[in-house]
Amino acid sequence: ACIDRFPTGTCKHVKKGGSCKNSQKYRINCAKTCGLCH
């Protein structure tokens, strides 16, 4: 599983919530942990 550094959830959860589009820190973190955050 692809878990990011934020305790709020996995990259999948972040992507579903739209945070990747709205937050640069989530995009950067997801890129480090599990590839591009679309």
Swiss-Prot record:
InterPro entries: ShKT_dom. SUPFAM superfamilies: Crisp domain-like. One of its GO terms (molecular function) is potassium channel inhibitor activity. Gene3D superfamilies: ShTK domain-like. Residues 2-37 form the ShKT domain. Signal peptide: none annotated. It is found in: Secreted; Nematocyst. The record marks 6, 13, 23 as: Important for binding to potassium channels. Disulfide bonds join 2-37, 11-30, 20-34. Transmembrane segments: none annotated. One of its GO terms (cellular component) is nematocyst. Pfam families: ShK. The keyword Transmembrane does not apply. Residues 25-26 are annotated as: Crucial for binding to potassium channels. Its main location: secreted. Coiled coil: none annotated. Keywords: Disulfide bond, Ion channel impairing toxin, Nematocyst, Neurotoxin, Potassium channel impairing toxin, Secreted, Toxin, Voltage-gated potassium channel impairing toxin. GO terms for biological process: envenomation resulting in negative regulation of voltage-gated potassium channel activity in another organism. Belongs to the sea anemone type 1 potassium channel toxin family. Type 1b subfamily. Inhibits voltage-gated potassium channels (IC(50)=405.0 nM for rKCNA1/Kv1.1, IC(50)=0.03 nM for rKCNA2/Kv1.2, IC(50)=1.31 nM for rKCNA6/Kv1.6, IC(50)=74.11 nM for hKCNA3/Kv1.3, and IC(50)=247.69 nM for insect Shaker IR). Binds the Shaker IR channels in a voltage-independent manner. No cytolytic activity on erythrocytes detected. Not active on rKv1.4/KCNA4 and rKv1.5/KCNA5 channels. This is Kappa-actitoxin-Bcs3a. It comes from Bunodosoma caissarum.
